Amino acid sequence: MPWTLQPKWLAGKGLPLLGAILLRKTEKSEPQWKHRRQETHPYYDLQVKVLRARNIQHTDKLSKADCYVRLWLPTASVSPSQTRTVVNSSDPEWNETFPYQIHGAVKNVLELALYDEDVLDSDNVFSILFDTSTLQLGQPCTKNFTRQQDPKELEVEFTLEKSQTPASEVVTNGVLVAHPCLRIQGTVTGDKTASLGELGSRQIQLAVPGAYEKPQPLQPTSEPGLPVNFTFHVNPVLSPKLHIKLQEQLQVFHSGPSDELEAQTSKMDKASILLSSLPLNEELTKLVDLEEGQQVSLRMKADMSSSGDLDLRLGFDLCDGEQEFLDKRKQVASKALQRVMGLSEALHCDQVPVVAVLGSGGGTRAMTSLYGSLAGLQELGLLDAVTYLSGVSGSSWCISTLYRDPSWSQKALQGPIKYASERVCSSKIGMLSPKQFEYYSREKRAWESRGHSMSFTDLWGLIIEYFLNQEENPAKLSDQQETVSQGQNPYPIYASINVHKNISGDDFAEWCEFTPYEVGFPKYGAYVPTELFGSEFFMGRLLHFWPEPRICYLQGMWGSAFAASLYEIFLKLGGLSLSFLDWHRGSVSVTDDWPKLRKQDPTRLPTRLFTPMSSFSQAVLDIFTSRITCAQTFNFTRGLCMYKDYTARKDFVVSEDAWHSHNYGYPDACPNQLTPMKDFLSLVDGGFAINSPFPLVLQPQRAVDLIVSFDYSLEGPFEVLQVTEKYCRDRGIPFPRIEVDPKDSEDPRECYLFAEAEDPCSPIVLHFPLVNRTFRTHLAPGVERQTAEEKAFGDFIINGPDTAYGMMDFTYEPKEFDRLVTLSRYNVLNNKETIRHALQLALDRRRQAGGRVGG
């Protein structure tokens, strides 16, 4: 646990969770830690000697280049280094050596960038990503980096030796690495010459580059002579230094149309202390000499957290809460299946198929339809047979509203449906009332009081709160633990994706799951307790607790369709691919025989040479690929590193193309660009990647046998399945082939079954497109409509431009709401036998496999 916990965290839910965490540490055999292990790895001394470059042309072609090389190894240093600038030369030589100490547990990728210096701005000629794990100990290696049919080249010499620094212990799950965290605490006082309060306009600033904390300007205390405290947390592997700066605040007068005083900072002097030189757990005092005979006294103490002292979970198995839920839910599902399938006796727990129900995105249309689909499953007695219930965007609004009731699935759904109808069918003008605006302002001030700024996504969450409740909703996601504690309801999984700047969700998206117990990334095997989502973590340790956000803010994030870029808007709404943008992207060359080398050593990364885009091209890309808005959340993986062999881990689920992609800046093969290197998460609507949360239920640990997919979108009836099939094929995930007759794409049926008879690990998929087919003529399964009123009720358009159920339609007439709920319910009831057949297939697979399959 962190060294200091906030008092609010210790109250309420914090204390039970604290006890649970302490208990976990005493149970070494606990299954949820089976993928986390402690390892000891050595340090290595790496010497990088930048020799020379050849055939470098100046960008303006009127003079020769002024070249320098920038080196950046973020796993071993806190900031980039660079050579001197060699002016007016097409063939510059440097012969400069840069030493690094690298840790053997992490993937150390060196970035080398050749620049042509300009008066206004330096031009990046090309950049290189070099995996240092390819080097042999004690054997100097000279690399000539170039690309085919390009005369430009850079020559660099590498030497790798064992270090005299003792090996250190880390914690890893095979994808991420957590180092011990170094904490520096201390006080600063003026010494013999002056106290801090006597520095006048001068100010002392402390900074540790690479630390979690920002530079800290020290303000005198209210009582003269009292010391000023400081704290820094940093990775000791980076050889960090404490910088003490004496600065002066100057008031500069500007003459002109508006004569104003402007504060400017002038650096007067600077001193540094190497933090690795400090003894651990010992208090010591250092006198630092600054300008004009000033001395500052620093009383400091350094301590190191143990490598295993983490406040997040590193592992690829299911958390305790979900495991306990499954044990109880299987008993409920066994009895339900016995009733529905007419079995002579209840199933053994290992024979109970795992059924997941998925709801697609689609705004109010999806939310309303899911109520009807769940009502149909409940009427068939199948809701108790469902293990997981997951949704994207609008479907998540339905699910999260249902889970306000701890026993919602044990009651008739007419009550929740009526509640939803009253809100969907009412006027939304109240969200613009003075009272509501005062509420928005109050929430905004509350955010700002905690040091946050409210984003448009957060404001959207408050609007969704009004839309769903028309009053303040105090509920939090962790409250839903009560709804699954006895296995009484399906386990809810809410979906979002983490995106990176200037990359579409189609090209790169990291699925993030939200459950009552945990929030985390299956890709990294990194999870935090739901109560701690939004708090500040560094190197796996909780540094600052913030209260868990109310669920309305999560609902805004899960349904943040407006966070699209122009590129995604054209792609999703118009079906247009802006291929001309490819001309404005930089190019990538893999400079070694990558396919052959990957077979020999799957842990190594290819050497990549990037030719960056021009400033104009960057501006064009920014216009089309920057997101209109995107909420940012504290990154709980910040400060963790990628494991040395992460590329060979099956748990790190990425496309095989990622390792040899020529897509500029594709992050998975560039560990320095991956999420643990970021300060914040950018979480948006999962529909930007796949408009249904298939990736979250396809994890092998969940061993899902049958997926019941409800697609409420306005996209093609099989598009979400086809996108999922490609996603799975690219990543080696078992999934059935989606083969449909072209006629079905034009005029789809109500239900389709997809299964791979030869692959029992592939889930059975039962897919329900949202169509008005037999419902138009039938009041109920097998009962035709008779009266004009009955026929009129069933005669409506569900898809196309003339539908009343568009993505931007948030208010329905009562008749429109009833039609959509009734249609969705009917489509389930009318396919009772197909559902039973799918369940029978899942049961047969379980029996043939002797229990668990898919895992």
From Swiss-Prot:
Its EC number is 3.1.1.4. It catalyses: a 1,2-diacyl-sn-glycero-3-phosphocholine + H2O = a 1-acyl-sn-glycero-3-phosphocholine + a fatty acid + H(+); a 1-O-alkyl-2-acyl-sn-glycero-3-phosphocholine + H2O = a 1-O-alkyl-sn-glycero-3-phosphocholine + a fatty acid + H(+); 1-hexadecanoyl-2-(9Z-octadecenoyl)-sn-glycero-3-phosphocholine + H2O = 2-(9Z-octadecenoyl)-sn-glycero-3-phosphocholine + hexadecanoate + H(+); 1-hexadecanoyl-2-(9Z,12Z-octadecadienoyl)-sn-glycero-3-phosphocholine + H2O = (9Z,12Z)-octadecadienoate + 1-hexadecanoyl-sn-glycero-3-phosphocholine + H(+). GO terms for molecular function: calcium ion binding; calcium-dependent phospholipase A2 activity; lysophospholipase activity; phospholipase A2 activity. The keyword Ribosomal protein does not apply. The active site is at residues 393, 685. Keywords: Calcium, Cell membrane, Cytoplasm, Hydrolase, Lipid degradation, Lipid metabolism, Membrane, Metal-binding, Mitochondrion, Phospholipid degradation, Phospholipid metabolism. Ca(2+) 1 binds at residues 60, 66, 116, 118. One of its GO terms (cellular component) is cytosol. Residues 304-855 form the PLA2c domain. GO terms for biological process: arachidonate secretion; cellular response to antibiotic; fatty acid transport; phospholipid catabolic process; prostaglandin biosynthetic process. It comes from the Eukaryota. Has calcium-dependent phospholipase and lysophospholipase activities with a potential role in membrane lipid remodeling and biosynthesis of lipid mediators. Preferentially hydrolyzes the ester bond of the fatty acyl group attached at sn-2 position of phospholipids (phospholipase A2 activity). Selectively hydrolyzes sn-2 arachidonoyl group from membrane phospholipids, providing the precursor for eicosanoid biosynthesis. The N-terminal C2 domain associates with lipid membranes upon calcium binding. It modulates enzyme activity by presenting the active site to its substrate in response to elevations of cytosolic Ca(2+). This is Cytosolic phospholipase A2 zeta. It comes from Mus musculus. The gene is Pla2g4f.
